[in-house]
Amino acid sequence: MSNDSTKKSFRPQQDETLQKGKKRSVDRYIVSRLLTYIKPYKTLVASAIAITIAGSFLGPLRPYLTKVAIDDYIVHGNLKGLTIISMLLAGAILLDGIKQYITTWMTQIIGQKAVYDIRMDIFRHLQKLPARFYDRNPIGRLITRTTSDVESLNEMLSSGIITILGDLLQLFFIVVLMAWIDWQLTLIVLSILPVMIYATILFKNRVRIAFQDVLTHLARLNTFFQEHLTGMSIVQLFNREEREAVKYAAINADHRDANIRTVFYFSIYYPLIETLSSAAAGLVIWYSAVRLLKADLSIGVVVSFVQYIWLFFRPLQHLSDRFNVIQTAIASSDRIIRLLDEHEGIEDPSGKQQIETFRETIEFKNVWFAYESENWILKDISFTINRGEKIAIVGATGSGKTTLINILSRLYPFAKGSVTIDGIELPGIAEHSVRKLIGVVMQDVFLFSGTIRENLAFGNPDVSDEELREAARIVGADRFIDELPGGYQYRVLENGTGLSSGQKQLIAFVRALLYNPEILVLDEATSSVDTETESLIDAATSRLMSERTSIIIAHRLSTVQKADRILVLHKGVTRESGNHQELLAKRGLYYKLYLLQHPEQGILTGALSSIPGRE
């Protein structure tokens, strides 16, 4: 049976600045997706909007009250009326402050909850993506998605949209009140708007691309930094510090230059807004002075309009600031949504068969596999594993040994052929169901930051302390664990730093034992341990494998001699099959591999064959 999923190539997440000058439909799609994260908190959103609408007239009301105070009470010496209007003004200021406090608190709660949901969706989605996706996408880039990109959304979701609504309503009330007070001065103020709108549209197109460039180079910066921190020992051993610093400087310079471009646009835009607002104020003052000289205008109107000018341009300034935030957020959202929309290779569990146990056989039949199209790693592989059987797979590096396990564990789909478990096609079985049956001990053991106990119980978090200690005793890990500060509560550093390779390998064996799989896979599991540790593991693995179907992948042939059957792979092809003695008797590839690792056996065999009468 052919698995068509491999016919589609897994593309890396595009990190370049794509689709420059995106269409509005794309922006609408992004906004609609973001709104789905706000929808669960619609009560909070509705309350924040209602309070924003209700309080949006309080700011514009203050200059009007000032105008009334001057023209109706100060000019006429009406102290009682002035006291009342002053109290109203103080009340408006107080209510405006309360409104701002409540809306700020509500919008921050909305934003934080939405950002939490986005991060959780990204993490769950990343857990579903297949191994091929991670082969082609740098970890640093993905980290940028879940940190910098998500954080860029925080301010927009926290205050951006609702603040914009409040600013627009304030502008509306300001224009209405200005027109009510004096329509001629209002037209002078509004005459600046066309220039401002044109500048904003022009600015939007350029700053959008600039922000995409910044995020692109930030992802590259994070990727390079993460890779080199992980491989710092290699950099130092090969004396590559200066050369790698030069590479980093180039990437860092790209990020710096991208930021400078955004700063350049803002350094033009913000002074332009300030200049326009000052020009409007100057025109209003000049025209007001002309009318005052003609006794065609009151002092209260002039004072209120000077206040209105700054109030009018303050929401516009806020809108431009929010526009900055939104441009950053839209660029980040585009990248996040493209990641969340990456569904290639994700299994749809509906219709997949669940299997609770392994009863009879695993069969590979004419299986072909390639990590890259047509670059075949496995070629027409066929073999069967019976329940309770101990199978060893040996061969040179790159022969496809680990690939077979990756296929069986459903980490990678095969291209052609058929793989079945108890007669059921592997692609038709749910991934979770297959992996529940298989426990894998890898050559490179990964330990998570946390306690020894948490790492041991990773596959079975409900295990009791007694069961955990017994498993450690069986494997022989209890001795070194008890000697650690804190024992089973010893804090493991990132990826097990501070523990030896042998200690990490023992932890992996305990973890597999506690997982209690029906099929045990040992993938070069003892290749990085010393002789003493290997002797501890040998006793434990014999006990582990006695009641389980076992697959042993090994480069060192000394670890596979007790296997029921040994498969010998060479360049993706099954060359030989049989037990240890049968394969030695054939004097084929296995025999040659054995002599390479045990040259003394070849000397002994040659000496015996030279004795007369011995063949």
Residue spans for each PLM region:
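Transmembrane helices of ABC transporter permease
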Residues: 40, 44-57, 88-89, 159-213, ...
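Membrane-integrated ABC transporters
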Residues: 1-59, 74-88, 103-107, 111, ...
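Helix-loop junctions and hydrophobic alpha-helical segments within the transmembrane domains
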Residues: 122, 126, 235, 336, ...
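Conserved catalytic Walker-motif region of ABC-type ATPase nucleotide-binding domains
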Residues: 126, 248, 336, 364-366
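Loop segments that connect adjacent transmembrane helices in multi-pass transporters
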Residues: 140, 213-261, 351-353
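Cytosolic ends of transmembrane helices, especially the final helix of ABC transmembrane type-1 domains
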Residues: 240, 264, 279-281, 311-339
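Hydrophobic alpha-helical segments in the permease module
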Residues: 88-96, 100, 193-200, 266-280, ...
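ABC-type nucleotide-binding domain
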Residues: 348-349, 355-615
